[in-house]
Amino acid sequence: MAPDSGSFPEGPPLKLLPVDTRDRGTQRCRLGPTALRALGAHLGSAVKISLPDGGSCLCTAWPRRDGADGFVQLDPQCTSPGSAVGAPGSGGIINLNRLRLVPCPPLRSLAVWPELREQAGASGAPSPAAVLEAVQELLRNRPVSQGYVVAAPPGAPGPVAALHIVSGAPSPNPAGLVTPRTHISLSEVPPSEEEPQPEVPLGGLSEAADSLRELLRLPLRYPRALASLGLEVPRGVLLAGPPGVGKTQLVRAVARETGAELLAVSAPALQGARPGETEENVRRIFKRARELASRRPTLLFLDEVDALCPRRGGPHQAPESRVVAQVLTLLDGIGEDREVVVVGSTNRPDALDPALRRPGRFDREVVIGTPTLRQRKAILQVITSKMPISGQVDLNLLAEMTVGYVGADLTALCREAAMQALLHSEKNQDNPTIDETDFLEAFKKIQPSSFRSVIGVTDIKPVGWEQIGGLEDVKLKLKQSIEWPLKFPREFVRMGLTQPKGVLLYGPPGCAKTTLVRALATSCRCSFVSVSGADLFSPFVGDSEKILSQVFRQARANTPAIVFLDEIDSILGSRSISRTECNVQDRVLSVLLNELDGVGLKTIERRGSKSDQHGKCKQLEKNEELEFQEIFNSNVIVVAATNRPDVLDDALLRPGRLDKIIYIPPPDEKGRLSILKVCTKNTPMGPDVSLEKVAAETCFFSGADLGNLCKEAALLALQENGLEVTTVKQEHFLESLKTVKPSLSHKDLTLYKNLFQKKEFSILEDI
C-alpha cells in the first residue's frame, strides 16, 4: 500500500454522487484521473475520507469508469460509528483535502464484535462457527480500522448485519488489510459506547503538519529498523511561532493521527514554590512518559517551554539554572527509550537556553509563521464549515482583508460575526444567518493580536486620492513606487523590477505630505504604522533601538505594511567624521539602516511557503497568484517625510534604502483651484463666488493655508450674518485674504530649489 502522504493542501471540490449499483459492497471509491494523480494513489490504495457529517470512511481508490474529473463515488461500507452506514446523499461537496492515503499493512490478528440480523422464523441464534465463517467472508481482502463499523452489503446472505472492529491494527497505523493469514476472533464484549472524536482538519497547517509527522513517524513506527541501521533520529522537536498560530492544536492532531499516547503538560504549571519542587515535578512527568511508553509510543508535549527553561547566566537565576540542568539531564536520558518523543512549543525561541537547542535534545525546529493568504482561507473554511454562512460571504475577500491574523484571531473574528448576526436577527432567532455586514462589524472590534501591542499603530481615517487637490504627478509617482508593486507583482517580476525599500517625501510644511501617505495606506489596503520621536525616545540606554526593532519585527508579521516616519529629521541624526561621540539618534539611525538592508531577519518571522515562488508567476492560477502576490510583498516599506532633507545622513539616501526621493512642491494656480474645490465641497457657496479668482490671489499659499482660508471665510459669514446664514460669498474670501497670510515665501522656495541643485541631491526628482 502507499505510504501516508498527509492531507492534500487546498484541493478542488469534488461533487459527491450516489454509489454505482455495481460497486455496492465493494468498499471502492471512484475518482477521476486528476484526483488520483494529486493524491498519488494507485489501484486499490487505502483512502480515508472525512465526510461532511463529521465522520470518516475507509475505502480503496479506483478510477471512474467514465474518466470524468470533479466527482467522487464511494461505497461507505467501512465507516466511523458517528457516520451513517448507508450511502451518503448525493449533491454534497467533498474537498480534495478531505481525502488522505493511509498505510495499510497486513494484519496478523483481528478482534471483531458482530451485530447479528433478526431472522424471521429462525429457531435459535446461529452457531459461533457460522458467525465466524460469515465474518471471514465479509472481511476478506478488505482494509479496516480500529473503532470502525463494517456493514454487510444489502441483500447479502448470512447472520451478520455489521461488524465492529474492536482491535487489530497497530496503533501507529490508521488501517490494516485483512488477508487469508489474518487470525480473526469474535469478541464477547461490545465496543465502548463512547464515540471517537471526529477528525478535525488542520486548516493552513498542512506544511508544518507534514514536517512534524515525518519526524514523529520514524522513531515511533520503525524503531527496530533504525536501531539496526545505527541511525539516531531526533528525540526532541521544538515548535516555534507567534501566539495563536495553532502549535498546540497541531501537536494534538498529529498525535491522534499517528496513534501515539499524548502527555500534554503546561510548563508553567510545573513551577513549584518550595526549593526543588519544580525539579521533582519535571522528573515525575518524564517518569510518567516512560510508563506510558511501555504500552504504546508516547509523545510528551511541553507547552510554553521557555517558562521552564529560560536562558541561564543572570546573577539571581540559581533556581532556574537547576531546573534547566534537570531538563537537560532528562532529555539526554530519553534517548535510551525510542518510544518517547519530546515536543516543546514556544513563541520566544530566543529566550530558551541554548543548551536545549543542540543536537540530541531539541535538535529539530519547526517554524510556524503567520498564515499566508492561502492558509488564512483554509483556516476560515474550517472555522465556518459548521456556521450558517450566507452565500454572499466571500472567503477569498475575507482572507485578503485579514492580513496579519493568526488562527486564534480568525476564530475570534468569526465568533464576533456570529454574535453580530445573533443581535441583528431578533425576528429570526431560531435560524440566524451570518452575512458580510456582520463580518464588517466584527472587523471593527477584532484586530490582529500581533498588532495589539505595536507602538505607533493608528486608526487612520480613510482618505481617497480624489480628496487631495492637485499634485497629480506626485500621486502618480507614489502609485508607481508603492501601490503598483503591491497590486501587480507579476508584471514587476517579469520586468526584473523589485519593490523599493523606502520613499522619502520632502517639501515645505503644509503641502500634504502626511495626507498623501494616509491616502497611500488607504488605497493599498495594507497595515499602517506611524512612528514619531515621542514613541521612540526613552531615557534608558538601548531602549530606543529596541523599540524601533520591535516596530519592524511586528510590521513584518503583518506585511504588506507601511512604516511611516513623520518628521524623520527629528528622529534620526546625521553622522559626522569630526564628531566622535555617538548619541541616541546615531544609534537609532544605525538600527534603521540595518532594518532597511534586511540584516537581522529572524527565522521565526518567516511567512509563506519555503519554495521559491518568483520563478512560477506565469503558471499561477488565481488563488496561487494571490499567494505569490503576498509572498512577493513580504517586505516592509518605509515612507519618511521631512521639510529638512539637508540634515539627513547621506547613508540613508543611497539606493537600496530610501531610494525613491520625491519633492512635494507648493501648489500652482491649477493645484490651488483643485484644493479650494476640495475644501469647499461641503460648504454652501454663493453664486458670486469665483474660486478661480481666489486661486489667482493665493500665491505662496500651501494646502494647509488654503484650508484655513476657507474656514476663515465661513466663520466671517457667521459673524456678519448670524447663525441663520446659508451661503459664503466672495466678499468673505476677499476679507479673509487680509488676515490669512501665506506660510511660504520666495526665500523658502529658493532654498529648496538650491538644495535640489546640490550635487549630493542630484538624484532627487523635481516635479
Curated annotation (Swiss-Prot):
In the context of 55LCC heterohexameric ATPase complex, the ATPase activity is stimulated by DNA binding and inhibited in presence of RNA. Its EC number is 3.6.4.10. It is found in: Cytoplasm; Cytoplasm, Cytoskeleton, Spindle; Nucleus. It catalyses: ATP + H2O = ADP + phosphate + H(+). The modification N-acetylmethionine is found at M1. ATP 1 binds at G241, P242, P243, G244, V245, G246, K247, T248. PROSITE patterns: AAA (PS00674). Keywords: Acetylation, ATP-binding, Cytoplasm, Cytoskeleton, Hydrolase, Nucleotide-binding, Nucleus, Repeat, Ribosome biogenesis. ATP 2 binds at G507, P508, P509, G510, C511, A512, K513, T514. InterPro entries: AAA+_ATPase, AAA_ATPase_domain, AAA_lid_3, ATPase_AAA_core, ATPase_AAA_CS, P-loop_NTPase. One of its GO terms (molecular function) is polyubiquitin modification-dependent protein binding. Gene3D superfamilies: 1.10.8.60, P-loop containing nucleotide triphosphate hydrolases. SMART domains: AAA (SM00382). One of its GO terms (cellular component) is cytosol. GO terms for biological process: autophagosome maturation; mitotic spindle disassembly; proteasome-mediated ubiquitin-dependent protein catabolic process; retrograde protein transport, ER to cytosol; ribosomal large subunit biogenesis. Part of the 55LCC heterohexameric ATPase complex composed at least of AIRIM, AFG2A, AFG2B and CINP. Associates with pre-60S ribosomal particles. ATP-dependent chaperone part of the 55LCC heterohexameric ATPase complex which is chromatin-associated and promotes replisome proteostasis to maintain replication fork progression and genome stability. Required for replication fork progression, sister chromatid cohesion, and chromosome stability. The ATPase activity is specifically enhanced by replication fork DNA and is coupled to cysteine protease-dependent cleavage of replisome substrates in response to replication fork damage. Belongs to the AAA ATPase family. AFG2 subfamily. This is ATPase family gene 2 protein homolog B. It comes from Bos taurus. The lineage of its organism: Eukaryota, Metazoa, Chordata, Craniata, Vertebrata. The gene is AFG2B.
